[in-house]
A protein has these predicted regions:
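Conserved donor-binding/catalytic core segment of Leloir-type glycosyltransferases
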Residues: 4, 190-217, 230
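N-terminal strand-loop element at the rim of the active site
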Residues: 7-13, 29-77, 234
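Donor nucleotide-sugar binding/catalytic pocket of nucleotide-sugar-dependent glycosyltransferases
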Residues: 137, 143-189, 258
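Active-site donor-binding acidic/aromatic loop of nucleotide-activated sugar
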Residues: 238-241, 252-262, 269
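Glycosyltransferase donor-sugar binding loop
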Residues: 201, 228-243, 259
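Aromatic "clamp/platform" in nucleotide-sugar-dependent glycosyltransferases that forms part
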Residues: 101, 281
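Short hydrophobic beta-strand element within catalytic cores of glycosyltransferases
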Residues: 298-302
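Conserved acidic donor-binding segment of nucleotide-sugar-dependent glycosyltransferases
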Residues: 313-324, 332-337
Length: 387
């Protein structure tokens, strides 16, 4: 079976975050099971010349991004050559798996898959929700609603996300919804050593609330004066403000900013940390949390995070209601007994419920159903039933 994983963007600094990480994890996992999975995406931030032909061992067709609508950021990038070859591309696949957002790449490729009669699986990563923005309304009218109604399966992370999708497309009109949590590989649990280390590893973006992380630092330093705080991830507009907050609080000597990390470097950063803090709001299902817990590093999240119920139930970290509670949660998890208990719980949560193998089992079942439903025999039966 050949599967195309279509995602909007890949950059050298992993600037697009979760959707690309999920696409790569799934494609790599599928290839390990004998599936011919490839990545199709735009590339940005690469030097002039030939673009990579594989990413982390996954064969990739990367087209150079053109910023045709800069004010819409990632939603405004496209590739004329990819769009021109979209129909030929989707015809080469047994299944087209699109990591869908309102943009000028994933929407057109998904439409091409429908038009060519290819089995189409959509995964929205919390990126499609009700919106009053004019561009969203136009794209929904032209493509989004039709795709959500006619796809062979629509993968959602949580019931909350499914509700958002139904609000966009209309009650009862969502095509074959299937809950597919994100999953990650399980790694050797970390061994705690050295001074206390607290990590922020995410985009520096308003929704991620990196300043909340910075504002918690003085409270932690009062009890752990040797604690170290690491800031990592690509800038999406909030880095300067976060560093200014650090300076204004007078804690710059305890803070290290290390910038964007590769996937391997990110895993090492999680392994070196005692606590990972992601203070973002309305985060559907952050891959960074899974990766932190996969090495046994406890996490601190806000209650609007899609993983908050699982983290709280398992005891894999702390869930806070207010931003001012982040410091207290970190202090609790820096205690030796609490840290060990949360570390073990985090690792078990990945092993038992959120492993990549469990996710791949579900996904392969979705693919098999989609291809059977599009088989000639199935089409003949459907036509007979309608006559």
């Amino acid at each position: 079976m050949k599967v195309l994983h279509v995602v909007t963007l890949h950059t050298p600094t992993n600037a697009f975050g979760g959707p690309t990480r999920v696409a790569l994890n799934l494609a790599r996992g599928l290839r390990g099971r004998g599936v011919d999975a490839e990545l199709v995406t735009l590339g940005d931030g690469f030097p002039e010349g030939r673009l990579p032909e594989e990413v982390e061992g996954v064969p990739a067709r990367i087209f150079r991004a053109r910023h045709v609508l800069p004010r819409f950021e990632v939603s405004g990038i496209t590739s004329p050559s990819l769009l021109a070859g979209a129909r030929r591309l989707v015809r080469s696949a047994d299944v087209v798996h699109v990591h869908l957002m309102r943009d000028l790449i994933t929407l057109p490729v998904a439409v091409a898959a429908l038009q060519c009669g290819r089995p189409l699986v959509l995964q929205t990563h919390g990126m499609i929700d009700p919106s009053d923005k004019p561009l969203a309304k136009v794209l929904d009218a032209l493509a989004t609603k039709r795709l959500l109604r006619r796809a062979d399966a629509v993968l959602h992370l949580t019931e909350w996300e499914r509700g958002d999708l139904e609000a966009v497309v209309g009650a009862g009109e969502l095509a074959r919804p299937v809950r597919l949590p994100n999953g990650t590989a399980l790694h050797q649990p970390r061994v705690r050593s050295g001074p206390p280390t607290v990590l922020y590893l995410a985009r520096f973006q308003t929704r991620k609330r990196p300043k909340v992380f910075a504002e918690a630092i003085p409270e932690v330093l009062k009890q752990y004066p040797d604690a170290r705080f690491v800031l990592a991830g690509p800038d999406s507009g909030e880095l300067a403000g976060t560093l200014e907050t650090v300076r204004a609080l007078g804690v710059e000597n305890a803070v290290r900013h290390i910038g964007p990390l590769s996937h391997a470097e990110a895993l090492e950063a999680f392994r070196a940390a005692d606590v990972y803090v992601l203070p973002s709001v309305d985060e559907p299902f952050a891959m960074s949390l899974l990766e932190s817990m996969s090495v046994g590093t406890p996490v601190v999240v806000r209650e609007s995070n899609g993983l908050a119920p699982d983290i709280e139930r398992a005891g894999a970290g702390r869930v806070v209601r207010r931003p001012e509670d982040v410091g207290k949660a970190v202090l609790e998890l820096l205690g030796a007994e609490a840290n060990q208990a949360a570390s073990q719980a985090a690792w078990r949560l990945i092993r038992d419920e959120l492993s990549l193998d469990a996710v791949l089992d579900i996904l392969q079942g979705v693919y098999e159903t989609a291809t059977k439903d599009r088989s000639p025999a199935s089409s003949a039966r459907s036509a007979s039933g309608r006559s």
